[in-house]
Every structure is written in structure tokens, then in C-alpha cells.
């Protein structure tokens, strides 16, 4: 039912059930709730996975990306062809929508390029259809060093915003 409201609703419902587990004790299938998932289809297929312990810096370049435009472009690309079946691999960072957005939104492409050039993240991946980009770290020392370097970084554009967080939790600060 949630997908009829919006493609991201099924994941949001699952994630919020996880985050509010104490208040929702006793509900059937709450055990399936997770703060992390592999999402496919148009967002209606949500397979819960255990969250990986990452330190994360989220970046937003201060522009809007049309989710509708990105999905329509992907739909046109796939029209008449079937998606290759991929085995879910939770060790791999991948976003089917990233190529279109990076190709058509120079600001996002510039952001990703600069993050990869100047920071020491293990992985850099766009979130959803964009424009937010996440830099993932397995080591807190590298994460903290990059966070500190960001405070005076000349490569950061004035319109960009960033937030520091940890995966699987609500420890958000900026």
C-alpha cells in the first residue's frame, strides 16, 4: 500500500519501525524492521539487511534534481529490455540512478569528483536520484581527520552543505 503514496514509502515505513521498535513492541513482523535495506523495483521491494558500521559525511550541492526526470530517463533506457538479474551483494556500493544524474547535473558530478580527490573515504555514492552524496568511512580516525579538514577546505563551494553521521543510528551533527 505504501508504494501507492510514493516509491520511498515502503523503506521509510520499515526504517521508522526499526527506529521506534521500543514503542512498537508486540507488533507482528517487527523483527523484519531494519535501519538498512536493499531496495529494488520502484522502491516497493525492500529487503532488510544488517546495517554496516560506517562513519558517513553527507554532502548536498545546493541544487535540486528532479526524481521524476531521473526515473523517466532510466525507464526509457530500459524500455524493451529486461534488467539483468543481480544477486544482492551488501558488500558492494551501487546506485543505478547515479550515472544519469552525474552525466546530466554537473554540480553533482563536480561534488563527487572533489570528494574523491580531497577526502579519504572508503566509498563515495550518490543517495537515491541525488543530489545528496555520501562519503563512507570504516575508520573513525580518517573520518574525523576529513571532518576537521572540511572546516577550512577551499575546495568546498559556498552553496554546499554537509552533515556527519554514523550508519545505523541517529547520531547526526553538523
Positions of predicted regions on the chain:
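Conserved glycine-rich beta-strand-loop-beta hairpin in the small C-terminal domain of fold type I
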Residues: 131-133
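ATP-dependent small-molecule kinase catalytic core of the GHMP/sugar-kinase superfamily
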Residues: 1-123, 136-174
